[in-house]
Amino acid sequence: SSSSGFPTDSKIYGGLGWLAGPVLVFGRGRYALDRRRTPLADDGIINTIGVDLPDTEISVKDVFGLDTDMTVPAFKKRTEYVPEIDPSYCFDHDTTIAILASFAHSRKLMVQGYHGTGKSTHIEQVAARLNWPLIRVNLDSHISRIDLIGKDAIVLKDGKQITEFREGILPWAIQHPVALVFDEYDAGRPDVMFVIQRVLEADGKMTLLDQNKVIHTHGGFRLFATANTVGLGDTTGLYHGTQQINQAQMDRWNLVATLNYLPHEKEVEIVLSKAPSYNNKAGKETVSSMVRVADLSRAGFMAGDISTVMSPRTVITWAENSVIFGDVAVGYRMTFLNKCDELERSTVAEYYQRCFGEELPEYKTVASTAA
């Protein structure tokens, strides 16, 4: 057995791979719990997490550095379902407060914002510091109603093949102290969204029709979602595959936080935390210029000059690639410029020239070449 009390030799198989740990397998169309080997909670529900309800409280000011007297419930024990802590992570004040309120008061929270702004990572890093088990499910077009609820499966028991119901990720999660995060929430299929809608109710009970069973929500269950749009469809052309969300369902989310592009200095701080080799006077000036390029790309996108926008994730990748290639210009071309439409590349190259005071070699003007 592992240190958490879980059997490490369980023979459980899934479609795409392990979701977390040796007990739960999450794959496309298949979920399995080894019911013969997992410990039972006091109420008879199989507990594969290793913890029950939060057993301590933490100070938000001490742990997150936010100017508030708020305290939040947390777990003393750290299990394998808890995300790893990123000690250099920079928290956005409003988004972090919303996430902490969701954990403290069981509020269902959707975090909306542009790509690469750290929506899912914010939730993960808050959960990591609370020792709160967390599972992320990507609502791509292959996630179906059966995946979420479960299905009958043929299993081998006492040497005989029998049909047994295997729970999906949703009924499993709501019976455990888990933060369940639905990524790409606005890309979910309509039939999948209506499965989730019942769990969004105030009492959060879920009925399994195949089992004639009503599942009650565990006191430690929390529900989150991340989305690029706010359920009204995509008007930017950036997010193909997203769709409008039923407004009756949107109304059930208790909180909606918006995490878009951050102030210049805050974004510089985040990039420096991820690329510490730039943490010197010259490096800080370089990173500040990188963020200015990103600011220009966003202004150009809003004005309709370009159709590709540079996210904070892109800036971090640019900084990392520049270290690899030893050249900021090469890093820019490899990270962002080559992703842009050919007709827009001269404009994107001009952003670089305006911020760094030099032109990219392949985009030098005739005048500058003559000079």
Task: Spell out what each predicted region is.
Residues 37-79, 96, 263-264, 272-371:
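Alpha-helical lid/collar subdomain of P-loop NTPases
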